[in-house]
Amino acid sequence: NNQEIIDKSSIIILGVTPNVGSTILRKLKFSKNKKIISLISTINLDKLKKLTKNKNIVRATPLPPIEIKKGPIVICPPNKGAKNLFKYLGEVVEIKNEKLSNKFWATASIMAAYYEILNVSSNWLIKKGINKTTANNYISELFLSLSQDAVNKKSQGFTKLVADSQTPKGLNMQVLNELTKSKFYFKFIKAMDNINKRVSS
């Protein structure tokens, strides 16, 4: 019983999907002393305050890797209680401006697309005769090493990593050029723009 859980809790985390969020919240009652953390991507703070009749609301974007205590967790607006709750699960990023925080929702939406790149790469190896376990191990280790290298060198900027990872007429340059010509990165940016519009509406 959602209402019973709310009544017995001091902190309520809203984790329902956006398409049913408004319907469910309208049926529930939140006392003004309750602290609310919303994980609902497309319901903004103003609407949340109207739906819950509560002003003590924070939006947060924890991603699945918090299971292994990794990854960024965006909190808007900054809130000490929410930060203390999430700081053990990942790297907390506090944003004052909700419009700016929506940009982080947009970039967080690339998760499935990222995993699909791993999936396509591994399946390509498998179709070429590589054992599935070997292919999955190789691809996961490859992307792990690239991600760790990016973390270690983030102060240099990612443009430098792009430049440093290719040689004139080399294999990496060829793949980058082919993807660029196919407008892969343009479509990637367009997709994030579309998500930004969706979460900002």
Model-derived features with residue positions:
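NAD(P)-dependent Rossmann-like dehydrogenase/reductase catalytic/cofactor-binding core
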Residues: S140, L144-S201
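Rossmann-like NAD(P)(H) cofactor-binding subdomain of soluble oxidoreductases
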Residues: N1-I75, N79-G81
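Structured helix-beta-strand junction loops
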Residues: K8, S31, Y88-L89, P168
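Internal alpha-helical scaffold of NAD(P)-dependent oxidoreductase catalytic cores
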Residues: K47-N56, G71-K153, N194-V199
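Small-residue helix-packing motif on alpha-helices
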Residues: I5, G21, N131-I139, L161, ...
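Transmembrane alpha-helical core positions of polytopic small-molecule transporters
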Residues: G15, M111-Y115, P168-K169
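Residues at or immediately preceding the N-termini of alpha-helices
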Residues: N2-Q3, N79, K132, F158, ...
